[in-house]
Amino acid sequence: MFTLKKSMLLLFFLGTISLSLCEEERNADEDDGEKEVKRGIFALIKTAAKFVGKNLLKQAGKAGLEHLACKANNQC
């Protein structure tokens, strides 16, 4: 009877340790995934800002050139 209790206690102890190791590994994997998502969102925002900025500068440049041409030809 005593050896059965020792065996059960040993199995419980080993199961608890393996469960805690699995949980730690799962938590580590989840943390890495969040960092990748954050990087992905930041890259998306950065790319969108570059695109919008480039288009705004093009439009401003065209408007500025048209205004200068208008002033130069006195057609305003």
Swiss-Prot record:
Tissue localization of expression: Expressed by the skin glands.
Keyword hit for Disulfide bond: yes
What's its job?
Antimicrobial peptide with activity against Gram-positive and Gram-negative bacteria and against fungi. Has been tested against S.aureus (MIC=2.5 ug/mL), B.pumilus (MIC=2.5 ug/mL), B.cereus (MIC=7.5 ug/mL), E.coli (MIC=12.5 ug/mL), B.dysenteriae (MIC=7.5 ug/mL), A.cacoaceticus (MIC=25.0 ug/mL), P.aeruginosa (MIC=50.0 ug/mL) and C.albicans (MIC=2.5 ug/mL). Also shows a weak hemolytic activity.
Is the keyword Cell cycle assigned to this protein? no
> Where in the cell?
Secreted
What does the entry give for GO biological process? defense response to bacterium; defense response to fungus; innate immune response; killing of cells of another organism
Print the keywords alphabetically: Amphibian defense peptide, Antibiotic, Antimicrobial, Cleavage on pair of basic residues, Disulfide bond, Fungicide, Immunity, Innate immunity, Secreted, Signal
Question: Which cysteine pairs make disulfide bonds?
Answer: 70-76
The entry's family comment says: Belongs to the frog skin active peptide (FSAP) family. Esculentin subfamily.
Q: Which residues form the signal peptide?
A: 1-22
Gene Ontology CC, one term: extracellular region
The protein in question is named Esculentin-2-ALa
Q: Which residues form the propeptide?
A: 23-39
